[in-house]
Structure formats: structure tokens, C-alpha cells
From Swiss-Prot:
GO molecular function: DNA-binding transcription factor activity, RNA polymerase II-specific; DNA-binding transcription repressor activity, RNA polymerase II-specific; RNA polymerase II cis-regulatory region sequence-specific DNA binding; RNA polymerase II transcription regulatory region sequence-specific DNA binding; sequence-specific DNA binding; sequence-specific double-stranded DNA binding
Modified residues (Phosphoserine): 143
Biased composition range(s): Low complexity: 461-470, 802-816, 1017-1031, 1402-1420
Main location: nucleus
Feature: compositional bias, Acidic residues: 419-428, 834-844
Domain of life: Eukaryota
Coiled coil location: 195-374, 690-717
Official protein name in the record: Homeobox protein cut-like 2
Organism: Homo sapiens (Human)
Pfam families per record: CUT (PF02376), CUX1_N (PF25398), Homeodomain (PF00046)
Alphabetized CDD domains for the sequence: homeodomain (cd00086)
Key word Zinc present: no
Lineage of source species: Eukaryota, Metazoa, Chordata, Craniata, Vertebrata
Amino acid sequence: MAANVGSMFQYWKRFDLRRLQKELNSVASELSARQEESEHSHKHLIELRREFKKNVPEEIREMVAPVLKSFQAEVVALSKRSQEAEAAFLSVYKQLIEAPDPVPVFEAARSLDDRLQPPSFDPSGQPRRDLHTSWKRNPELLSPKEQREGTSPAGPTLTEGSRLPGIPGKALLTETLLQRNEAEKQKGLQEVQITLAARLGEAEEKIKVLHSALKATQAELLELRRKYDEEAASKADEVGLIMTNLEKANQRAEAAQREVESLREQLASVNSSIRLACCSPQGPSGDKVNFTLCSGPRLEAALASKDREILRLLKDVQHLQSSLQELEEASANQIADLERQLTAKSEAIEKLEEKLQAQSDYEEIKTELSILKAMKLASSTCSLPQGMAKPEDSLLIAKEAFFPTQKFLLEKPSLLASPEEDPSEDDSIKDSLGTEQSYPSPQQLPPPPGPEDPLSPSPGQPLLGPSLGPDGTRTFSLSPFPSLASGERLMMPPAAFKGEAGGLLVFPPAFYGAKPPTAPATPAPGPEPLGGPEPADGGGGGAAGPGAEEEQLDTAEIAFQVKEQLLKHNIGQRVFGHYVLGLSQGSVSEILARPKPWRKLTVKGKEPFIKMKQFLSDEQNVLALRTIQVRQRGSITPRIRTPETGSDDAIKSILEQAKKEIESQKGGEPKTSVAPLSIANGTTPASTSEDAIKSILEQARREMQAQQQALLEMEVAPRGRSVPPSPPERPSLATASQNGAPALVKQEEGSGGPAQAPLPVLSPAAFVQSIIRKVKSEIGDAGYFDHHWASDRGLLSRPYASVSPSLSSSSSSGYSGQPNGRAWPRGDEAPVPPEDEAAAGAEDEPPRTGELKAEGATAEAGARLPYYPAYVPRTLKPTVPPLTPEQYELYMYREVDTLELTRQVKEKLAKNGICQRIFGEKVLGLSQGSVSDMLSRPKPWSKLTQKGREPFIRMQLWLSDQLGQAVGQQPGASQASPTEPRSSPSPPPSPTEPEKSSQEPLSLSLESSKENQQPEGRSSSSLSGKMYSGSQAPGGIQEIVAMSPELDTYSITKRVKEVLTDNNLGQRLFGESILGLTQGSVSDLLSRPKPWHKLSLKGREPFVRMQLWLNDPHNVEKLRDMKKLEKKAYLKRRYGLISTGSDSESPATRSECPSPCLQPQDLSLLQIKKPRVVLAPEEKEALRKAYQLEPYPSQQTIELLSFQLNLKTNTVINWFHNYRSRMRREMLVEGTQDEPDLDPSGGPGILPPGHSHPDPTPQSPDSETEDQKPTVKELELQEGPEENSTPLTTQDKAQVRIKQEQMEEDAEEEAGSQPQDSGELDKGQGPPKEEHPDPPGNDGLPKVAPGPLLPGGSTPDCPSLHPQQESEAGERLHPDPLSFKSASESSRCSLEVSLNSPSAASSPGLMMSVSPVPSSSAPISPSPPGAPPAKVPSASPTADMAGALHPSAKVNPNLQRRHEKMANLNNIIYRVERAANREEALEWEF
């Protein structure tokens, strides 16, 4: 036993239980880790299996399934095995891990065993048993191993089995306890960690807060320190200041002390001297003392006198101030009064305009009827006897006799009233009256027998006119010519018809039903007629009178009735719209289909219904319209007419008219067989020059007649029509109206008829040149007088009149035959419809050219159209030549890809910078809207009608350049041709030349360049002409823009700004001269440039220009030069060194302007100053010499001169223009001075020798007389007024004075106001800015008259047509010389304007026109007021001044006669030259 125990003890001693337990622990942890891993992998495996099932197709799954299943079984088996092994291990582990070490127990057991060993006797059994029991009692002493093995340390093996079961339970219990403890420990640790983390976070936040607080406090500290430093510094400064102040104060105090001491000393010395003086006897020193004593009183006296003087001066100052205030107040009051008057008058004008607008339709109906009658009469009386119906003639004469007073009534107010009133109004009247029969004064018109005799006024009536003078102004606001409105309207139409067919057509009473009552009343009463008839007449609105407008019309009913009538008579809406409403077919259709109720209509909207009502009121109207319709359908002629016939006709008509005008002036000499009209005028017979001219014109007329018999019918009647005005009160009315109206009339007549009988081909250019030579030689220098109105008239008559013969015809048919085209006074007629009609006429009626033959006068009517200058003409509906049948066939039935076609067209348009409007007008014959629509949304070819396909066919033809309209050629054609030929006075190319011009290639390109507003034309081209030629021609710049690579707009603008600021150049100057933009636009561009890709073609242009400018090495110098020139020009203007007119500061001056006429849009941009071209003295000398040799230089001469003098050709041309006109003015002035001496009694024709018959020294064929001009001028310059003044009356002296002034101005002007190329207007002229651009669509029209047709213009300067002289005497009364000069200046400006117009270039005669509009009207009228009134004083300035005081003052009739003649001839020549000039072919084409 002992051995047993010992061996056990040894065994357990060797056995390291603790190490074993540790190893078991580590293995257990490994196992648990592995178990987790295996769980994860198991899960992963399951997921993979699912994915595999999802993703793998079934076939594969079936193939792989057995492998997978076996694999799965393996895995499952493995996992089971490992779990079992783990479980076994764990069970062992659980038993061993907590087992106590048995070694100590064994040791104790052994020791006991040893103690018990010796007694080997039996009784030992008892203690053993006890021990056994003690073991039993303390089973926990047994080691688990023993328990497991069933051994007990001492007891017998029997008991072991019973002890074993309790041991594993205890082990489990201890294990769970241990686990719990660990878990609790871990929890504790986690909680500790969490709390630590939380605390740490809080601590960090606190640290951050502290950091930010620290920073804030640091910043505050710094701020405080800074403030402290500042305060310290300021305190230091203050202290320093205080110290310096103290020092200064100390110094002052010391100085004061010193002064005080010195004063004390002086006082003491004075006192002592006084004492001495008192005490001591007068000795030699006494005088001195006296002196010192006296000096005091003397000083006081001096001071007192000074005080008195100061007081006196103060009083003077106060007095002056009060007088100044009074003056200011007075002037302010005057200004206010004038403003009030102005507003009153403008209101009156507005009212009148409204009335006119409201009442236009009546006239139109009248015209239709007149046409009808004319046609009937024409057909019935082919022989056209001139004195056809005596009673009618007598009626006419009665009317004529009646009209002078009327006319004077009408005129006076317009002359006296302020120039604001719409001059077009009295023009029109004058035209209507004066042109037809320049009514002889009643005294001279013996009232012929006839039923209407009562109408002819008694001889006393003419006095009415003058007596009216003073009231005129007052009553003006009512209506400038109401009396006329009623009376004349009543009477003129019949008169009008007389021209039409040679006899009178008095309309049926129904037509004039409303009028007769008012008529008789008109002539008799004095001033009342001005206001009187108007109420009765309603200002003339149609037969219905004013009531018609006020009453509520049933629009639906009217529309219904109109439709009914149109259907019944088979009249088309287009014709109805054109002739009756002045509207397009679309508008008519809209109005008739959906008439709005009356109350919802605007004033303008009511007009068509009023017109329709008036149209319906008389069956005659409907019949007339039907006739027109029938005739229209009957004759469809091509719209484009050969230039030949056009210009020939024009020439013919001009000459015809000229003849007529001369007759009218010679009034006394009966011209035709119409006896009643040829009543002697009471004036002396015309001079020989007049006869000569007359004979030339007669001869021309005969030649023309030989060429075209057909025109005879038309010529007979109109020729006898005019009787000259004799009353001196209206001297110039005659010219204005006669010249203007008949001119137009005749011209229209000419152009109206031609289509039907084409002239035999004769080169018009040659023919006209010869006539011009003759006329010029006859006219002498005096003949170029009235360019202005000539030009205006020309322009007026042209835009429609000559723009297309077809138009003329159409318009003529539209405007009955009042010979002057306006039998109705302007007063009761709205300007709009007529213009519309004109436009429409142009559009619609070209076909009717043929039929008009019968109505010569009808045609004239058309000519008159343009007299509604205040109205901006609608652009003509584009008319394009019809497609030829071949072209139709070629394309009509061939499939076309419209999308591709429109794309190509758009590309070509963009590339060539052609705008859609031009393209539409010139190529497709469509409006811009239609073109835009067609290009953006082309319909497929299959869906297009035949008409719808036409535009696409045209596009194809255009793309393949088979269409005449050379839209694309802009740059070449537009630049070259218009400028050169037009401006050169050399004979124009013969009309037979390029026929293609008839297709308006040129106009097209011109317009397109206009359209795109090539600013560079005006802008970049240098002002001085030479200066800035960098810019491209309009087409050019656009191509550059189209081709230009992407530019960095930002950097460009940045550079431009830098260059401008570095060189102190203003944005305005830069914008105007380089970009052609206003200062605002430039500022906007430079401050906010858009990126290149967002800009349109147009928007890119300024940037391309900037880039070009930046690349130009001389850009800054050029701008500086411009700036200097501007300054110079400004100073000259400012200090009166130069006449306003001559500053070429207007668009015109851009000599380099590539496109000959600026676009209307440009003009608005271009209202900027531009430096004049200043010529050096030697250049002027050279030019003068050249002038002596050739006043009308040929193109070669011009080019040679420009090359030699290094000037631009434009400059040379303009210099010649200016110089010629200057010479003419001087001749005129001389003439006016001489005239009183030569012909005090006043034969109209006796011209001072040398004026009308200059000695025929050899000269250039064009102007045989011009050569004398220089000599005249030199004489005048040398001798000056002295020579003249001796024989002169005071009047004449005044004129001389003016003349000198002119000469100075001229010298200035010569120095360089070469208007460059397109209309020059001075800044001073306000509105006239719009001058040159022709209204769109009238490209080829004369561009001479700057304003009249322009959009803005409320009135053309032609208004000044007011009787020329009268207006000068009465209206332009500038009581002070200054204003007088200003008048001359402003008018001069207009003179120059016309100079530069291309047409002017070709017709030198123009240059001189003088329509004396008062300068006062300058600001108001849209175009320069007139040509130089001051230069050609009608009477003398003094007379003018007197006129100011006596409105009815009269002008010397002889003078007037002479002026009228000159104006006439001037006008004739101008128009003849225009007609001959092939460049103007466009006028006749459309």
C-alpha cells in the first residue's frame, strides 16, 4: 500500500497538471475559432450553392449535381466528424481544466501512510477505516484523476465507484462560474471603455471650444492693438497739430505784442508831437506836424469816398442783378409762350392729321369715279378737242377765279403759322391748286359765262388773302386750309378731269352731294372761311361728313353689303382693298370675314368701315371699281419694263412738263386753244431766254411726239391747264405747285402710257444730253435755283412715280385723274391710304400699264402720290419677274428635296450676308415673314401646290445663278456701280447697256448691304476720306465674319479697353468710327462680351471689326486724327467760323462708305459728328483751275485730279458740286441785287445780262455757261460789296452783306465740306438724320431729297415749297441777323445733303435748289429745312425782316418770276438728267 501511494505520489509529482491545463485552454480556443470559421465557410458554401443554382443553366446544374451532392455529403460528414471530435475533446477538457492538483494530497497521504506503516498488527484496521471515513467526508480532496480512476488515497477500491459521479457536476459548476466572471469582467471593461471614449470626446470638444475662444481672443487682441496703434497715431498727429498750432499762436502772439508795442511807440510819438505842436511856436517843423495831423482827416475822407464808391457799386450790382433776373424771367416767359404755342400747334397738327386720316377714303372713291369717267370720256371723245365743253370750261375758270383767294387763305396761315405745321399739307394743296391751274388772280380772270358763274369771286376778294394774314396764325390751329377743304374739294375734281380727257368731267351731284352747300360760302367771308367751312365739312372726311365717324356703324352689315356688291359685280377683294381701303387682300378678307363691332375698333380700325360705307353710298363707286377690275383682268403685261422705254417716257414727260411750266409762268401768252384759260396775266412778257428755252423744249416735245404719237392724246389736255399766279402774294406758290405737280404729273403721264406703244429705240442718254446742253446754255447760271424742291419733288415723284412705270399706271388708275393728283386738299385727306394705294398700285397693277393710255391725266394722279410725305411709304410689295415657261417645266414636275434646298439657301444667304427681306423681295417676291417661314419649315414638295412650288423653283434658279437677281453680288455691284456712275456728272452709260440691271441686281445687293447695316461703310471708312480705309466693303466684312475662326471675345474687348484707356480715346468715337455703333452699344459690348458661339452672324461683326482694328498698326493715330477733326469742326461750328451746313459731320461724310447710300437703320446709328474733309489751299487752287477748264468734269478728269491731289474721287466730285452750286448762288444773289436796278417795273423775263445769255465762250458740252462762274466769284471777291453797293437800295446792301457771309461760308465749305457720298446732314439738323437711305425697296430712286420719304419724317423739306418767295418773306422772317444766318446755315446744310446724293451727282442743276424753308422749321421737319434761303434772298433780308413785322408784306414779283423760272428749269434739267442716267434704270424697272 505504501509503495502504491509512493509511486502515485511520484507519478503526480512528475505530472505538470497546470501546464496541461494551459495547453488544453489554448487548444480549446483554437477549436472554437476553427468552429466559427467552419460555420462561416459552411454559410458561404450554402450561399455559393444558391448563387450557383440561380446563375447556372439547368443542364449544367444537372450535370454537376451528383458531384455537388457527393461533395456536400463529404462536407457534411467532415463537419459531423469534427463536431464529434470537438465534443469529445470538450468533455475531457471540461473535466481536466478545473481539476485541483492532487500532489499535496498525495504528499499528505504518504506522510500519513508513513506514520501508520510501523505497526503492522491488525488493530490498524480501525484507524484505516477512520481514515477511510475521513476521506469519505472530504471527497473534495480527491483529485479528479483519482476519482476518474476510481482510486482513493487510502480507502479500499470498493468505495471509489460511489464517489465518482459527483465530480463532473462540480467541474461544470465551477466552469459556469468562471465564464460568468469573465463575462462580467468583459462587460465592466466595455463600460469603462465606452465611458472613457465619451469622456475623451467631451474633452476634445472642450479643447476645440477653447481653441476657437483662444483664436477669437487673439483676433480681438490684434484688432484692439491695431485700433490702439491707430488711435495712438491719430493722437500723436493731433498732438503734433496742436503743438504746431500752439507754436503758430505763440508766434502770432509775439507778433501782436510787437505790433502793439510799435503802435504804442507811434501813439506816444504822435502824442508827443501833438503836445509839441500845441506847446511850441510854429517853426520850420510846424509844416511837418500839420502834415501828420492832416493825414488823419485825409485818410478818413479817402475811406469815406471809398465806402461811398463801394455802396454805389453794390447798388449797381443789385440793379444789374435785378435787371438780369427780369431778363431771365422775360426770356423764360417767352420760351414758355413759344413752347405753349408750339404744343398748341403740334396738337393742331395732330388733330388735323387725325382728321386727315379719318377722311381719306372719300378721295379714293372720288378717284375711282374719276377714272371711270375719264375712261368713258376718253373712249367717247377720241379727238380730244381742247376746248371741249364750254360750260365746263367756264365752270373751271370760275373755279380758278375762286381759288386764288382760297389758296391764299390756305397759304397765309401756313406761312405765318409756325413751321411746325405739316408742310406736306399745304404742299398738297398748292399742288392741287397751283399745279393744275396756277389760278390767276380773280381780277385778271374775267369770269366766263357759265352756269357756275356765281362762284367766281368779285375782284375785291383777293384782298381777302392779305387781310387774312394776321388772323391766319390764330386760326391755323383749326385747319390751315379748311376753306379750301370744302370749296376746293368740291370744285377740283371736275377741274381735274379736264386734264384727263381734254374736257371736263363734272361728277354727278350724288358724288359731291355733301359739298355744294359749303362751297359758295367759302370765298366771300374774311378770316372765317378758315374755320367756317370746316365744321360743315367735317374737315372733309367723305361725303358723310363728321357725323359719319361719330355715328355707330353696323360693321357686320356693312361688311355683308360690301361682300354682296363685290360678288354681284365680280370685283376681287384685292382690287377693292387696293383702291377703296388702301389695304392688302389679306386684311380685306379678314375685315370682311370677321368684322369687329364698331365700339371695339380703334380710330384706325374704323377707317375701313367708314370707307366701305362711303363706297356703298354711291352706285357710281361700285361701277368705277368694276371697270377697273375688268380692265385689270383684260391687260396683263409683264411687270418689268425695258429701261429704254422707261427713261424715254420719263424724259418725254419731263420735257412736256417743262414746256407746260414755262407756259404757266408766261401765263399771259396763251399757249393752247383753250381760250378761257389763256387769260393775259397782266405781267410783262417773258424774256428772250425764256423763249429760247421754250423753243428748245418745244422742239424736244416735237421730237418726242414724233417718236410716239400715242402720247399726243395725253399731252393735249394737260398742256393748256396751267394759268400762272399773278398776285404777288402767292408768287412762289405757283412755282412750288406748278413745278412740282405738273412735273410729276407729266412725268407720270409719260410713264403711264409707254407700255402700250414702245418707243423706237433711240439712245435716251444722247438725246437728253443734247437737250440738257441746250437748256443749260439758255438757262445760264441763274437756272439752277431750287434744287431743293426739285430734288424733293424729284424724290417725291419718284419713289412711286418712277419706281415703276407700271406703278405709275396703277397708281394712276388708283388715283383718278385729278391732274395734280390731288384734287382734294390735303386737309381732308389722310396721308396714309394714298400712299398705301401707291404702294399697292405698284404691287398690284403693273399689268395695267397698257390701258391707261386714255387717261393721261390719270397717270398724273399717280405721280402725285408721294405728296403725302409725312407718311412713310409702305415698301412696294416685291415684284419679281415671272418665271419663264421653260423654267417652270424644268422644275415644276421634278421632285425636289425642299429641306436640302432651304438649307443651301440659308447657307448662301449667311455666307453672303444677304438678309431674308431682300432675298424675299428680290428673288422670291415674298415678304420677309413668308421667307423666314419657308426657310425654317419647308413643306415637302409633294404637299405643295403649283403656286407653293414657285418660291422653291426660284430658290433653285437663284442657287444655280439662273435668276436675274444677283442677290449675291453685293459687294461688287453695290459698291462699285452706285457710287461711281451716280456721282460722276459725266454722261451716263447708254441705257442699252446691261439689261440685267432691269432685274435689279444692283438694287438688291445694295439693299442687302443696307439691310445688314454694314456699319463699316459709314463707320470705319475714314472721316476725312483718306483716313481709315481699313474697313471692308459691306459684303466683305460679312464674308470675313462668316469665315472668321472662333475669336476670344473677352480678350478682344479687354485689349480694346486697354488701348482706348491708354490712349485716352472715348468709346463714342471708337464706336462711331470703327464699329458703327452708338456709345451705349459699345459700352455694353465692352463690359459684357458674349461668348463667340452664342453670337449671331450680325453679333460677331463688331468683334471682327475690333480684331481688325487691333491688328491695324495705325489704329490709334487714325482715331486721334478723327478726334482732332471732330474737335476742330466743333470749334468752328461753336464759334461760328463755319456754317453748320458745311460741317461734313453727317453720315454723308464718310467718303469711304462703300455702300453708296446709308441704310435707314444706319442713319439712326449714325447721328454722329464726323470731321470734315479739309482741303489745303493748293488743292483748292488746283481744283478751281480744273473747274475753269471743265465745270462738269468727266470721270477721267475726276480720277486724274483725285490721283494728282491724292484725294478721294468722292471728295473731288463733291468739291465740284459744291463749287458749282456756290457759283450759282452767287449769280443768283447778284441777279437779285441787280434786278431792282435793271427792271424796277418788273418784266419777269428781263434777266440781267450775262445771266441768262452768257457769252458763248467754248466750254464743256455739258454746261456752256458755268465757266463764267468763277469769274463772277472772283469779281465779287475782289470788289466785294463796294462795287455793288453804290447803286443798291438798302435792301440790296443787306443782300450784299448776306452774300459776303455766304462767301465766307462757302470758302469754309470749299475747304472741305465734301459731303461724302451719302447725304450729309449736320448734327445741328436734328431730325434730318434720316436722310439718305432710300426707303427700302426704292433703291434706285433719286436720293436727292433727303427727307421726305423717310420713315421718321413728318414732312419733307419740300414743304417749304410754300410759295417760295412768300415763305421767305413771310415765314423766314428772322428779325435778327443771327437767326438769318442760322437760316442760311441750316438751309445750306440741306443743300449739301442733296449734293452728295448720287443722283445729285449726275444732275448738277440740282445743287442749287432753294426751297426756302425757314430755319425755324429745321428742328421739326424731318429733313433739312430747305436749301439755302439765305443765299438766295427772295427779296432782300431787309425785306424779310420787314416781313416779320408785316406778314402780308409782298415780294418783288419780278424777282419771283425769275426765281420761279430758274426753279422750273432747274427742276427740268434735274429730271432730264436723271432720266438719262442709265444708273437710275432701276427707277423705271420694277
